[in-house]
Each structure stands twice: as C-alpha cells, then as structure tokens.
Amino acid sequence: MGVLRAGLCPGLTQDMVQLLQSRGIKTVVDLVCADLEEVAQKCGLSYKALVALRRVLLAQFSAFPFNGADLYEELKTSTAILSTGIGSLDKLLDAGLYTGEVTEIVGAPGSGKTQVCLCVAAHVAHGLQQNVLYIDSNGGLTASRILQLLQARTPDEEEQAGALQRIQVVRAFDIFQMLDVLQDLRGAVSQQVSSSSGTLKVVVVDSVAAVVAPLLGGQQREGLALMMQLARELKTLARDLSVAVLVTNHMTRDRDSGQLKPALGRSWSFVPSTRLLLDSTQSSGSLGSWRVVCLTKSPRLPTGCQETVDLGSLGTPAFQGDHKGH
C-alpha cells in the first residue's frame, strides 16, 4: 500500500500526515495496523477521526472477496459472443469472438490474416450493428476492400454507409503510436454512452508483430518491456471494457528445429486466450484460396481441431462456405 500523504483520501490533511509520521506511521499499512487509541493519545488526534480515516483507507485500498456465484453472474452479464460471420471460424471459436478476451490469428505472409480481419469487421458492423476499431499497422486496410465486403452483404447503399460509419480506422506504425491509441481508447470508451449505432465491441489490431518485432533481439532491451506493456493494454481493454480483441501475428522459424512457429516468443504466447493458425501449405498441391485453420490454443475446446475456409468466397454473399472439420 501507498505512503500517507495529504489528499490520499478525504480527511487526511497535511498536519495529520506530519503528526503521524513523527510517530513512525508513514504508510497506509502502518496506520491500519496501529493501535488507534495509542496513536490518538501520542499524536493529539481525535480517536473518532482516526477510526473514520482507517475505514476510508480500508475501503479504498483493500481487496474485497467475491463468491463464485457472484462472479459467474457478473460473467454472464458482461460477456457477449460475437459471430465472425465465417462459419468455420465460429466452430473453432466455440460460436465466435468472446468479449473480455484476446484472440490471435497467426499465419505466414499471404495466408489471409488481413482478409479474415476485414471480414470480421464488416460482419460486426453490418450484421451485428456494433462499432469496430481497426488499428492498421501494416498498411493492409483500404476503404475499397471494406466496401467490397459490405456490397457482398447488402445492395442497400444506406446500409453500406451505416456499416462504414461503424468502422473506425486508426493507423499506428510503431508501438508508441499503438500504445497511445489504446490508452486514449480506454479513456474514451469508459465514458461512452450507448447510441443507436451501438457501442464498441471489437478492436482489431493488424498486426502486433509489425510494431513489436523490430524492437526484439539484439541489444534492444526495452523491446520486451514495451511488448508486455502492449499486452497489458490489450488484456485490460478487453477485460475492463468488455470488448473482443482480435490481433494478427506473423510466423518465424525456430532457430534450433527450423520449424515455423508464431512470432514474438514465449512471453507473448500467454497473451491471447485463443490462437488460430492459418496455413496454406497443408494438403498436396496448391490450395489456391483455400486455407486450413487450426486451433492451437483455447480455454474451451480441445486444440488440434481443424476447419477449412475459402478466402476467395469471403467477399461473396454466401460466404459461410464449405468447410470440413478434423
């Protein structure tokens, strides 16, 4: 707990702080654990005032226990499951993106990560009538691509325009810009009022590796700290504001085995609750626009489950698509 200082809580004045410090009571813990009758006599302070002060400090700094039933009820009221609009992905995600969680899509360049993110943004904005923040860090987003996806969903130009208004795009090409965006967003969303256009429900970051990878390795020791700060911001945003966070990540080759693995290392692997791998190399011959999607991390479903999705069909009206489970 913190050091006692004037203004730390109502009723704690500078004169009171000086008197307490003169008797060796310098922190909140010192005051909470002290014999208040003895403190009142030695410091010449009102016993009732000290009791009231301790109650305020306990309320302000203590952790209050919750029973499991209350936590479960809170979870039910704060959690929403948002369909991605892609049937095969929803299967692997146990119905869709969960608010309060970070979901990661991993894949090599050209595997279709951005296409999936754009489809999710278009579906949430049009189909679910909710707002989306799309943070683009690799220049992969264009308004024409989003419009094309919306045109595949509805011929109504007013509906297309309404969906476009629900998708806010921010470009952040380094980690400091991205941290600023997320911190500003947390402050703005915490004060937002639900409107007819819906509240923010999905944050897409495409991609985290683009801003983090340049900071890792070599002598850049601050890189790991900045990466974990970004991780905290994303998880806090998801949990405290009940939004679903969808991020993309690159693949890298393991130095020892030579096998491909998700970038950003072991520390980052604990950030996403769910991780999907987009792979265009499985099966004999070329898959073309088809991709194999493998569930490699999940709190709800067994890992190793696979589905296939046709990226070429994601811009067409019937884009739920053929898919095969394994």
Swiss-Prot record:
Binding site for ATP: G107, A108, P109, G110, S111, G112, K113, T114
Organism lineage string: Eukaryota, Metazoa, Chordata, Craniata, Vertebrata
Protein name according to UniProt: DNA repair protein RAD51 homolog 4
GO molecular function: ATP binding; ATP hydrolysis activity; ATP-dependent activity, acting on DNA; ATP-dependent DNA damage sensor activity; gamma-tubulin binding; single-stranded DNA binding
InterPro entries: AAA+_ATPase, DNA_recomb/repair_Rad51_C, DNA_recomb/repair_RecA-like, HRR_RAD51_Paralog, P-loop_NTPase, Rad51D_C, RAD51D_N, RecA_ATP-bd
SMART domains: AAA
Annotated region described as preferentially binds ssDNA, given as residue ranges: 1-83
Localisation: Nucleus
Tagged with keyword Glycoprotein: no
GO CC annotation: centrosome; chromosome, telomeric region; microtubule organizing center; Rad51B-Rad51C-Rad51D-XRCC2 complex; replication fork
Organism annotation: Bos taurus (Bovine)
Main location: nucleus
